[in-house]
Regions:
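Non-catalytic, compositionally simple segments
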Residues: 215-310
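N-terminal accessory segments
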Residues: 1-103
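Conserved nucleotide-state-sensing and coupling region of NTP-binding domains
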Residues: 139-197
Length: 310
């Protein structure tokens, strides 16, 4: 369940120690009535809710106050917000698809740095809460993992119904396909890479780790299969003006990302790339120095170098 601050009544009690009893404004001093505290707390809660609806990381923190935000999360969240804003603008006729450079995005990150939590769980719920008409595709290297994303987003949406003023559809029992009341079959579709995708075209499709690990990435057959699936299945299921976000750990230069970037050089879809290695190398999109850790609060340089040596 979400962990939210509750409005607690302090009427008839003494001011808690450390709470000012007067508010100063210029040369004027006005008394602070302790009876106003519940109303002030209620106003603060309304502000938090409004910020949560407007910004992805504010939403994530509102629902989970223990969520640890790294600077890379801020960069990613800004990109995700730019992507959904362009999708909405195109849908509403305020932008042409050719005017956006945010509809094809790749995010390269090491394992266990919060990429799936932010991109494949929080982002779809926040996005759908704000735009219930959207259809989302959540995909990964296995159908089981994709369905887990579907299950987790559904449960998070249930916890967020009050915040966004939406409600899960009565038939939202399936983890791989669910929606909101009145959404006319729009919602979440989850599938494994290589699997069939049916239904309405997606406004945003997320591919989260299309290849499981280094061993599978070493197989040319696996790499070719992921690329063919993207070209013949996922890409054909996009709605006009739809976006694709590929978030992955790169295990091989000839992986899905490598092939799509090679296609870009030949005139195919243009991709925006956020490359965030565990340890900074050369020019860094976060402005890190060489060898500086991506998320030092969780994994410092010493531990990352030990892992690299091992």
């Amino acid at each position: 369940m979400p962990r939210r601050n509750k409005v607690v009544s302090h009427v008839g009690t003494k001011a808690p120690e450390g709470l000012p009893t007067q508010l100063s404004e210029g040369d004027k001093t006005q008394p602070l009535d302790i009876k106003d505290v519940p109303n002030m707390l209620g106003q603060l809660e309304c502000i938090r809710q409004e910020l949560s609806r407007r910004h992805l990381l504010d939403y994530t923190l509102y629902m989970d106050e223990g969520y640890k935000i790294g600077r890379h999360h801020r960069l990613i969240a800004a990109q995700l917000e730019a992507t959904i804003n362009d999708v909405v603008a195109i849908h509403e006729g305020r932008m042409k698809e050719s005017e956006s450079d945010n509809l094809r995005v790749m995010i390269f990150m090491p394992p266990r740095h919060g990429k799936s939590r932010l991109v494949s769980q929080e982002f779809p719920v926040w996005g759908m809460g704000n735009h219930p008409w959207m259809t989302w595709m959540l995909t990964s290297y296995s159908a089981d993992l994709a369905q887990e994303f579907g299950r987790m987003t559904r449960n998070k949406m249930r916890d967020s119904e009050e915040l966004f003023g939406v409600k899960l559809a009565e038939d939202a029992a399936r983890a791989d396909r669910w929606g909101l009341e009145g959404s006319h079959d729009n919602g979440i579709v989850a599938a494994g890479v290589g699997g069939a995708i049916t239904g309405k075209g997606a406004h945003i499709a997320i591919i989260d780790d299309p290849i499981k690990n280094y061993e599978e990435a070493s197989s040319e057959t696996v790499r070719r299969s992921a690329y063919n699936w993207y070209q013949t299945t996922l890409r054909t299921r996009l709605a006009p003006g739809g976006a694709v976000i590929v978030v992955m750990t790169r295990w091989h230069q000839d992986d899905l990302a490598g092939r799509l970037l090679a296609d870009m050089e030949k005139g195919a879809d243009k991709w925006k790339v956020l490359s965030l290695p565990a340890l900074a190398e050369g020019t860094d999109q976060l402005g890190r120095s060489d060898g500086e850790a991506l998320w030092p609060e969780m994994y410092d340089e010493v531990s990352l170098n030990r892992t690299r040596i091992a």
